[in-house]
């Protein structure tokens, strides 16, 4: 039987649990995919698997109104659920960064249902957000039921997300590195085996339940030569700016909808109506998008340019108005279109250069997706698994590296971290920084506080606290509020005469404005010590009610901070040392 101790002490136990999670998530992804297809078939009256663009041409009224009705249902549902659960939904990245992998299964199902409704009604959003939220939520809930430690719970969240992407695209390598890059915050030896096991198990189950053909499939490019690599680099540079444009478009749309004098629950309906009107002109904008579908890339330059712009606008309208979902699949379509468009422009300007069209399509797909999603290795591996062509992957790697460099230097965020920034969440990735906020002054402080009233004399202070009895004594006002720190070395200074014995100790108190609050994290505590240049600081109830509840020494705060850093490093390496995996 799997218990907490067996999981802590057995690599095989963790692998078995990860494999079981992967299989369960693979089943969930297959069911969600069928639910989306069924919903779209019902809403748009299309045959199973038929493209939504074809339905738009057959029934314009349904195309115009279906996204609006879906948006209205979504808005009402969110409003009603908010009365029951008003908290924000924590996604896998935020959970691993701030909460040690703790996620709510109910909240994850909320997001999954909202994304299913959004995608099913034609909103230009992807289902990958629902897949990863459901997978990570299932894994986190199971880990919490087993009372796993923080590092193991974070790993299980990564397993759930990796399994979701692996099952969705039939790409276990891409799914695993999606977890490493976005959900875990990095690759470590300790997490390689469980995340790899979950990815493979998810793909196996998904292939067993559904069509085993890959979600993305391309013919192999021709031989890759020197000019092709140069073209991939230039394309990556331009793709980086396109990625920034797509992310900023969502922000502009969101601000625009917020400025409208309509209730929040009505915004998705209005956004859906605008999306439906756009779909009457460009039907391919409905739904997540077909990825970099070769059928869309076989169109003329003008048609590809129109679809590229329309897809950016459609995604911005959908996400900005309140539909739930992500830009994973949309970014693949945008990148593929951009690569095909770039090839056509080069052929017009420099005919006979001999560039490979499909290579530029793949490089554009990887570069734009990496810029928006923030997972460069994932996109390279996704292309590699889709094409099974190492030369193509090398060209894509160049475009991806240049694109992510442009986005990082010019913008500084991926789409996920940009959304965190707009919400005021202080994280740039899934690196575990939650322990910093959990190690507070309340946890660091000691309760044996030595205080004295400011009205008492120096002689009284000497009698109450003889030389060597205490390093620091805190002065307090008659009402108990903090008034400053008294240096006991100065109090027992031999140079002080008898006339100084009657001096009120309040005159010796310093640093009256230097104190800690119970909720201050260890980083804030150390910064306060650095600025105050004292050995100990009091912890007060609040800046207004300055009653002392404890004190923290700089030496102890530094020691605890170092221990936690060592513990984090040990967990990354899978060590079982004093401060590693316990």
Q: Where are the language model's segments positioned?
A:
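Short hydrophobic beta-strand motif reused across regulatory alpha/beta modules
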Residues: 177, 381, 483-491, 549-557
């Amino acid at each position: 039987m799997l218990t907490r101790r067996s999981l802590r002490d057995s690599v095989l136990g963790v692998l078995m649990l990860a494999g079981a999670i992967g299989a369960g998530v693979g089943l969930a992804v297959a069911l969600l995919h069928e639910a989306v297809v069924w919903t779209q078939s019902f809403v748009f009256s299309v045959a199973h698997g038929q493209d939504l663009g074809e339905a738009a041409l057959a029934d314009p009224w349904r195309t115009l109104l279906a996204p609006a009705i879906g948006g209205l249902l979504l808005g009402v549902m969110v409003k009603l659920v908010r009365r029951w659960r008003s908290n924000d939904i924590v996604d896998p990245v935020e959970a691993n960064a701030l909460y040690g992998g703790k996620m709510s299964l109910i909240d994850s199902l909320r997001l999954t249902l909202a994304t299913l409704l959004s995608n099913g009604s034609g909103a230009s959003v992807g289902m990958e957000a629902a897949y990863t939220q459901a997978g990570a939520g299932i894994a986190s809930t199971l880990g919490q039921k087993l009372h796993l430690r923080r590092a193991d719970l974070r790993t299980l969240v990564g397993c759930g997300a990796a399994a979701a992407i692996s099952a969705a695209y039939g790409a276990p390598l891409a799914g695993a590195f999606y977890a490493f890059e976005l959900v875990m915050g990095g690759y470590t030896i300790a997490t390689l085996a469980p995340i790899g096991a979950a990815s493979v198990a998810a793909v196996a189950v998904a292939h067993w339940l559904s069509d085993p053909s890959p979600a993305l499939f391309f013919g192999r490019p021709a031989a890759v030569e020197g000019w092709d690599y140069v073209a991939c680099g230039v394309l990556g540079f331009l793709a980086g700016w396109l990625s920034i444009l797509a992310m900023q478009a969502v922000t502009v749309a969101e601000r625009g909808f917020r400025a409208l004098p309509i209730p929040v629950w009505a915004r998705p309906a209005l956004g859906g109506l605008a999306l439906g009107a756009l779909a009457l002109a460009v039907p391919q904008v409905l739904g997540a998008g077909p990825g970099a579908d070769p059928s869309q890339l076989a169109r003329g330059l003008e048609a590809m340019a129109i679809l590229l712009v329309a897809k950016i606008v459609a995604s911005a309208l959908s996400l900005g108005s309140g539909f739930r979902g992500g830009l994973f699949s949309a970014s693949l379509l945008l990148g593929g279109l951009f690569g095909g468009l770039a090839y056509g422009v080069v052929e017009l300007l420099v005919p006979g250069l001999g560039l490979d069209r499909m290579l530029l399509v793949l490089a554009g797909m990887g570069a734009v997706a990496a810029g928006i999603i923030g997972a460069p290795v994932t996109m390279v591996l996704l292309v590699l698994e889709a094409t099974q062509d190492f030369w193509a992957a090398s060209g894509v790697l160049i475009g991806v590296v240049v694109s992510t460099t442009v986005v990082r230097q010019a913008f500084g965020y991926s789409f996920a971290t940009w959304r965190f920034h707009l919400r005021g969440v202080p994280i740039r990735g899934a690196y575990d920084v939650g322990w910093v906020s959990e190690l507070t002054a309340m946890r660091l402080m000691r309760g044996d506080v030595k205080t004295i009233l400011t009205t008492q004399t120096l002689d009284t202070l000497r009698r109450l606290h003889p030389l060597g009895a205490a390093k620091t004594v805190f002065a307090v006002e008659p009402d108990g509020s903090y008034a400053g720190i008294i240096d006991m070395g100065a109090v027992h200074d031999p140079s002080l005469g008898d006339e100084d014995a009657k001096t009120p100790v309040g005159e010796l108190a310093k640093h009256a404005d230097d104190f800690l609050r119970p909720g201050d994290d260890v980083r804030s505590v150390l910064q306060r010590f650095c600025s105050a240049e004292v050995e100990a600081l009091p912890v007060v109830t609040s800046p207004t009610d300055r009653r002392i509840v404890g004190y923290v020494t700089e030496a102890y705060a530094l020691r605890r901070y170092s221990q936690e850093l060592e513990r984090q490093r040990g967990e990354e390496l899978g060590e079982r040392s004093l401060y590693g995996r316990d």
